[in-house]
């Protein structure tokens, strides 16, 4: 019985996606986290390096607001938002180049996206703010 339990534990462990323990702080890649500087280049560099080095966790620090345009998520990357961290979509619509609907620009523009990638996580206790307008849903508070 003990052997069976150990065997099942091994199988479950092997079935989980493998995420490296390497940690990449976006501030180390030049992110300001002040809510007005475009941090997309720094965030993308952190994601690229993390994936190229075998994967790990890209951390957005607590108490900071990271303004960002489109980000391509890559294999083996866990995008982790500390409690109190905010990932804020850049409101400048001109910077969004890819549409989920192909050539139909203006609809379904991609902010956080991946292509031919695997083992991606977006998690943590922070906030992802798509910077959308209130519109019809503004009347329904959280």
Question: Which residues make up each language-model segment?
Answer:
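Positively charged n-region of N-terminal signal peptides that target proteins for export
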Residues: 1-4
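Bacterial N-terminal signal peptides
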Residues: 7-17
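Extracellular/periplasmic carbohydrate-active domains that bind, remodel
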Residues: 19-142
